[in-house]
């Protein structure tokens, strides 16, 4: 099909503008965040080293590899999450019966004695490994470690929460979350994935993602509120970061996410935090299904993909529902106020309209 020259000219301008935006704004943001991560990780590593001295079951999985830290996730430019992997989940069965969308429990295997578990004192009378009890013990250890840490003048434990959150230099919050890595298994609640007859992701990539597995996190969550208090304390949150990152390899997918995060920081940091990086990542995965061919993820198409994601976001905000990519029964807008969602919808539409109607939009964004 012949494309009119004026359309090619518009597309070339858009590609140029997006590349310029990436070089000037996105890479600046990434550089600033990398600098902050290096600064805070030195302090967090020191705290976790002291924790490990007191309690060898809690081993730091925050490691530096080729100049980058693995095991830390950027939630916002000032809020980070470090996942601390625990050892020896083996004597427990993973129970994912759908009664707690987005969560699961770990139950002592039939015939296994409590004494066979490394985590014996955290097992409830019903045989569940309690996420809350492990977190409570870890909280105590971190509080003691902060007092002994050489950086104690610049790090404090955030009070009035069961979660372990460190405030560093009065500016950055780092949440440290105990977790189990579940490799070689896939949750029943995500068994429908991938949807049949959609060419993306390729079966080889699906097999890779499923063998990589998922994580179980010990953290407070809006998805558990209002449930049985005991179950809420024992339950672990399903977490698919590794799987999601694996799916976003190839083409301009990760670059697209970096641009979305930069636009979010600059234009969608709104009251009530209705839009997070995770919402954007989720909608990017849905956009990958809608546009399965690799040719649809090159430099020439990135403007269309950004618009597609923002239009999806407007629809989700107006319907007040954003389904999790792997667990669609889980609404990622749960707990967000309708007013905040309505306000966000207007801001996203303004941003989307700007990108759609002006080839110079990225100069102003």
Curated annotation (Swiss-Prot):
Belongs to the mab-21 family. It holds the Pfam family Mab-21_C. Disulfide bonds: none annotated. It comes from the Eukaryota. It comes from Aedes aegypti. InterPro entries: Mab-21-like_nuc_Trfase, Mab-21_HhH/H2TH-like, MAB21L/cGLR. Signal peptide: none annotated. This is Protein mab-21-like.
